[in-house]
Design a protein with these regions (language model features):
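Conserved N-terminal catalytic core of the sugar/cofactor nucleotidyltransferase
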Residues: 33-93, 107
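Residues at secondary-structure transition points
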Residues: 18-21, 26-30, 51, 71-79, ...
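Conserved alpha/beta core of the MobA/IspD/sugar-nucleotide pyrophosphorylase nucleotidyltransferase superfamily
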Residues: 2, 144, 148-194
Length: 194
């Protein structure tokens, strides 16, 4: 059975929302807590959380996830891949999950992993209406390309080179919604009140 790892990318300096982005609350639960709760741990051989925040490291420990310190949060979106992926180099596939999709459901992530197991040569991502979102699960053959990424080039760069290898699992649009600005978070809170 293929070994699958998960990298939760909780490392960004969140320039647009300030450093407390991951602590921002929606319905009484922080974005980082929601992100960790959305990880179907039983589907993975190992889960690592890449962050520079001690409180996130502590929270990762409560979930029995490994925490990896991100020494260069200013380096851009590729950087969590660099410390996260080597910790999972013995895996056959690795899923990359962001921490600013507060409505992402763990059931959807579990279904994504199950879909990948049926087509382990493919990159599998959540999507809606044919538009790709996160998370994405990459087979090991793409690890070298992921490790070559620099600065603000994330996994998207690799996917664009290999569109024919991409499979999308359709989920409701709300699950893919990211809150990377204070305004986006306030809009989401306002909608939740309706």
């Amino acid at each position: 059975k293929p070994k699958i790892g998960c990298v939760v990318m909780a490392a960004g300096n969140a320039r647009r929302l300030g450093e407390k982005k991951l602590a921002a609350q929606l319905r009484g639960r922080s974005l980082i807590l929601r992100a960790l709760e959305a990880v179907p741990a039983e589907k993975f051989d190992k889960v690592v959380v890449v962050t520079q925040y001690p409180e996130v490291m502590r929270l990762a420990g409560e979930f029995h996830f490994a925490a990896i310190h991100n020494p260069h949060p200013d380096y851009g979106i590729s950087h969590p891949i660099e410390p996260g992926l080597p910790a999972l180099r013995d895996c056959d596939g690795v899923l990359f999950q962001v921490s600013d999709q507060p409505l992402l459901r763990r059931e959807s992530v579990a279904e994504l992993v199950d879909r990948w197991r049926t087509r382990p040569e493919k990159i599998v991502a959540l999507g809606h209406g044919g538009v790709r979102g996160n998370p994405c699960l990459f087979p090991a053959r793409f690890f070298p390309e992921l490790l070559e990424l620099r600065e603000d080039h994330g996994g998207n760069t690799v996917i664009r080179r290999h569109e024919a290898d991409l499979l999308l699992l359709d989920v409701p649009a709300e699950e893919l919604r990211d809150v990377d600005t204070a305004q986006a978070l306030e809009e989401l809170k306002a909608e939740e009140q309706v």
